[in-house]
Amino acid sequence: MSEEQDPLLAGLGETSGDNHTQQSHEQQPEQPQETEEHHEEEPSRVDPEQEAHNKALNQFKRKLLEHRRYDDQLKQRRQNIRDLEKLYDKTENDIKALQSIGQLIGEVMKELSEEKYIVKASSGPRYIVGVRNSVDRSKLKKGVRVTLDITTLTIMRILPRETDPLVYNMTSFEQGEITFDGIGGLTEQIRELREVIELPLKNPEIFQRVGIKPPKGVLLYGPPGTGKTLLAKAVAATIGANFIFSPASGIVDKYIGESARIIREMFAYAKEHEPCIIFMDEVDAIGGRRFSEGTSADREIQRTLMELLTQMDGFDNLGQTKIIMATNRPDTLDPALLRPGRLDRKVEIPLPNEAGRLEIFKIHTAKVKKTGEFDFEAAVKMSDGFNGADIRNCATEAGFFAIRDDRDHINPDDLMKAVRKVAEVKKLEGTIEYQKL
């Protein structure tokens, strides 16, 4: 700490200056009136007592500054000691880890007493084992993974639940900044979806008060590009719950039983991290109708579907886990999957009407630089049969027309040319007739 920053030194300096000024005034003799005849200058006098006082004060300042410096050094040394202690502890733990032998992994089967448990080792045998004193007994429930000492088989620590890497990667889905305000033409569908998913998670007491059971899940079906996946993303971003994004095709595995195991792991992870939403896109990959004939691969898909049905039946009605499924082929789904009690609500996501297309045009061109008066009504009339993805593509194509003309904005003519171009491409697409489920 410098002398200017130290309030004590500053105070001492002010006191010294005041004393010196006072002594000077006290010692200054009365000046005689000067006359023209005689003027005599007296030599300045130095008070020995004042000189000793100033000397002692300066010495005290030096000692105080030295004390401050030593105090800062002491603090730095203590911080260094704490850092070295942390490094020492880490090194000790590393040495112990290198010198210690491995431990077995087991699963708690039953509690016999506070100190004795039946544990199933990973190799298969079951043992009655003790517990280390530092282990929390209240967490030793049935099915909990623990480590066992390789010699005494004592429970050493509790392990987290084993999660399949494939299931864990499903939880790292990027939700983005999608909101319901960015989805146009689906007001009624958004209301139905939020009633089934959001309302039971945020206000479950409403259903208890009325005396009804909230639905377990919802099926979104309709033509491609109408916003089914977008709705699920908006739900996840709005509620703030844990979200598992699982394309149904990614669940299918070539080894027998692996697909069903992934389904079990996924639902177990969801129950442990409630509130949680499971979104299965293109569910027709595993939810197709079952039939007696078929290859071994078809039978494996049917076993996966049966495991999915079993897990959905095991849900608590007022639990904090909800499921959303999406497909553009609802006619191929198995009736057992569609029955009430599993997917209680089916929401059709149709092609947008004129009002919906107008709203979608405004949403997708909101952030685009524009010049001139845009007549969206003309674009809406020309875009009959377009879905939301087609309208977004119109905004992109209009931007390309502006780039070709070396402009940094689009004009109404660019948008009309883009609509005509997308309409020409739409002729190549087939159509599927959808009926309400």
From Swiss-Prot:
Keywords linked to the UniProt accession? Acetylation, ATP-binding, Nucleotide-binding, Proteasome
Disulfide connectivity for this sequence is none
- Positions modified as N-acetylserine? 2
Q: Where is this region: Disordered?
A: 1-51
Claim: Nucleotide-binding is one of the keywords in the record: yes
Alphabetically, the GO molecular function entries are: ATP binding; ATP hydrolysis activity; proteasome-activating activity; protein domain specific binding; ubiquitin protein ligase binding
> What InterPro entries does the entry give?
26S_Proteasome_ATPase, AAA+_ATPase, AAA_lid_3, ATPase_AAA_core, ATPase_AAA_CS, NA-bd_OB-fold, P-loop_NTPase, Prot_ATP_ID_OB_2nd
Q: Which GO terms describe its biological process?
A: ERAD pathway; nucleotide-excision repair; positive regulation of RNA polymerase II transcription preinitiation complex assembly; positive regulation of transcription elongation by RNA polymerase II; proteasome regulatory particle assembly; proteasome-mediated ubiquitin-dependent protein catabolic process
- Compositional bias (Low complexity): 20-32
Q: Does the keyword Protein biosynthesis apply?
A: no
Task: Name the domain of life.
Answer: Eukaryota
Give me the Gene Ontology terms describing cellular component. Answer: nucleus; proteasome complex; proteasome regulatory particle, base subcomplex
Please tell me where ATP binds in this chain.
222-229
Q: Where is the composition biased (Basic and acidic residues)?
A: 35-51
Q: How is it modified after translation?
A: N-acetylated by NAT1.
Query: Coiled-coil intervals in this record?
Result: none
Query: According to its UniProt entry, what is the function of this protein?
Result: The 26S proteasome is involved in the ATP-dependent degradation of ubiquitinated proteins. The regulatory (or ATPase) complex confers ATP dependency and substrate specificity to the 26S complex.
Similarity section:
Belongs to the AAA ATPase family.
| Protein name per UniProt | 26S proteasome subunit RPT4
